[in-house]
């Protein structure tokens, strides 16, 4: 299933269920293995710190609309999810609904996965989103997780004391094997992205050649790039 087909499926599910917070439930119920090699690497890694570094490095193999970043202060571990490409499907309302679904499913999915190391991690979590509050959040079981609205960045934080929390199912051999598959997936993605970018630039040059070649900044603007 292509990314576009999956996006249409999500929008239809949101419409049919009339549940704009479906992303939260989806994230809580998703299994790590649904993320392929990255999920298997996550399940076999040594501790929370390794899991966070792993996801930051190979997140792009699962979805390219966002990029994760994490850092630590004196008290908390912060995990942020920043926009890379705009989420668009249909009109502005559908696009916003899809974006909210993706962000919520990724944030709450990450919290759900980290709970495999310790169930207490979720209890200390606070989620940050960049949109306004909505009454329908009251109908969702947030598992004691607090949500902060109108924030500058989307993400979540949890107590620093869990950084070195061990994985009881850690398996170094399985982890290294999964990493090889992750590297292979990332290499394929880079090759495909380079090939697609070359095609897109070539198309822009050919399409507008009769009016003179566009500048590089103009091509970047048309391709939604910097």
Residues of each region from the PLM?
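N-terminal low-complexity or simple alpha-helical regulatory segments
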Residues: 1-84, 102
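Short hinge/gating elements
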Residues: 36-41, 92-97, 184
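A short, terminal or domain-edge coil/loop segment
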Residues: 41-55, 80-87, 124-136, 171-191
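Generic solvent-exposed, charged/amphipathic alpha-helical segments
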Residues: 52, 56, 107-111, 115, ...
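DNA-contacting interfaces and partner/effector-binding or oligomerization modules
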Residues: 61, 67-164
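Extended mid-to-C-terminal alpha-helical interaction segments
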Residues: 133-137, 141-226
């Amino acid at each position: 299933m292509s990314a576009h087909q999956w996006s249409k499926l999500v929008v239809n599910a949101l419409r049919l269920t009339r549940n704009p917070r479906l992303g939260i439930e989806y994230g809580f119920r998703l299994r790590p293995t649904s993320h392929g090699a990255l999920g298997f690497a996550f399940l076999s890694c040594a501790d929370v710190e390794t899991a966070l570094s792993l996801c930051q490095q190979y997140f792009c193999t699962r979805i390219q609309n966002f990029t994760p970043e994490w850092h630590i202060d004196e008290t908390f571990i912060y995990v942020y999810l920043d926009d890379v490409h705009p989420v668009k499907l249909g009109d502005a309302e559908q696009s916003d609904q899809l974006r909210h679904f993706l962000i919520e499913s990724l944030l709450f999915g990450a919290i759900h996965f980290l709970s495999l190391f310790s169930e207490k991690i979720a209890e200390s979590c606070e989620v940050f989103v960049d949109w306004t509050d909505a009454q329908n959040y009251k109908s969702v079981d947030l598992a004691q997780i607090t949500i902060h609205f109108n924030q500058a960045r989307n993400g979540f934080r949890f107590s620093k004391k869990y950084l070195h929390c061990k994985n009881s199912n850690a398996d170094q051999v399985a982890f290294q094997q999964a990493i090889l598959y992750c590297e292979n997936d990332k290499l394929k993605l880079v090759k495909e992205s380079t090939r697609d970018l070359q095609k897109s630039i070539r198309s822009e040059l050919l399409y507008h050649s009769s009016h003179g070649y566009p500048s590089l900044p103009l091509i970047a603007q048309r391709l939604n790039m910097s």
